[in-house]
Swiss-Prot record:
This is Protein-methionine-sulfoxide reductase heme-binding subunit MsrQ. Its cofactor is FMN; heme b. Binds 1 FMN per subunit. It comes from the Bacteria. The chain crosses the membrane at residues 10-30, 82-102, 116-136, 153-173, 178-198. It comes from Escherichia coli O81 (strain ED1a). HAMAP family: MsrQ. The gene is msrQ. Disulfide bonds: none annotated. Part of the MsrPQ system that repairs oxidized periplasmic proteins containing methionine sulfoxide residues (Met-O), using respiratory chain electrons. Thus protects these proteins from oxidative-stress damage caused by reactive species of oxygen and chlorine generated by the host defense mechanisms. MsrPQ is essential for the maintenance of envelope integrity under bleach stress, rescuing a wide series of structurally unrelated periplasmic proteins from methionine oxidation, including the primary periplasmic chaperone SurA and the lipoprotein Pal. It is a multi-pass membrane protein.
Length: 211
């Protein structure tokens, strides 16, 4: 049985709760000693992992809708992507304000040079920013065929974000490996589209360098 519009609407409500409840828990944990010995790192890792979960969920929607024959499920993809961006922004903000401090934001440029995993994180966030800004139907109509080309950059985020996570942890544990494995699996499900995206990107870079 296929999902109805009403059921998808309720599903969106549940997904909004899934995006909001972790934030409420984090606020509670901060105020009630629910974090570990290094609360700053805990906040950074929690926000980053939550962003990664929503990224993976976003990538899951298309193959799930196709194989389950639930076309209306696609309507939840934008919502999940926006929650991914929201949590990625919280992740970046927690690093900038809690790790560096308001008075040391000028050090961010130096940090990006000395810690390459931060560069991967910033690149991922900038891409997510562009995708969030252009996620509306109005922007889709305005950009035309270029809209899909832009939004295919989510595949690059799906590669960079797990590497950023793996690189940032001092001790490799199963958790970042699981996230990386899930990202590889979700990318493998659309390998033809992935190859087409990177071939087009390679040609564009080559053309720019040839000018």
């Amino acid at each position: 049985m296929r999902l109805t519009v009403k059921q998808v609407t309720w599903l969106k409500v549940c997904l909004h709760l899934a995006g909001l409840l972790p934030f409420l828990w984090l606020v509670w944990a901060i105020n009630h000693g629910g974090l570990g010995a290094d609360p700053v790192k805990d906040i950074q890792h929690f926000t980053g992992r939550t962003a990664l979960k929503f990224l993976l969920a976003t990538l899951l929607i298309t193959p799930l809708a196709r194989y389950a024959k639930q076309p209306l499920l696609i309507r939840t993809r934008r919502l999940l992507g926006l929650w991914c961006f929201a949590w990625a922004t919280l992740h970046l903000t927690s690093y900038a304000l809690l790790e560096l401090g308001v008075n040391n934001l000028a050090l961010l440029g130096k940090e990006l040079i000395t810690r390459p995993y931060l560069t991967l994180g910033i690149i991922s966030w900038v891409i997510l920013l562009a995708l969030a800004f252009t996620s509306t139907q109005a922007m889709q109509r305005k950009l035309g065929k270029h809209w899909q080309q832009l939004h295919n950059f989510v595949y690059l985020v799906a590669i960079l974000a797990p590497i950023h996570y793996l690189w940032s942890v001092k001790i490799i544990s199963p958790q970042p490996l699981i996230y990386a494995g899930l990202a590889v699996l979700l990318l493998a499900l659309r390998y033809k589209k992935l190859l087409s995206f990177f071939n087009r990107l390679r040609k564009q870079v080559h053309n720019k360098l040839s000018l």
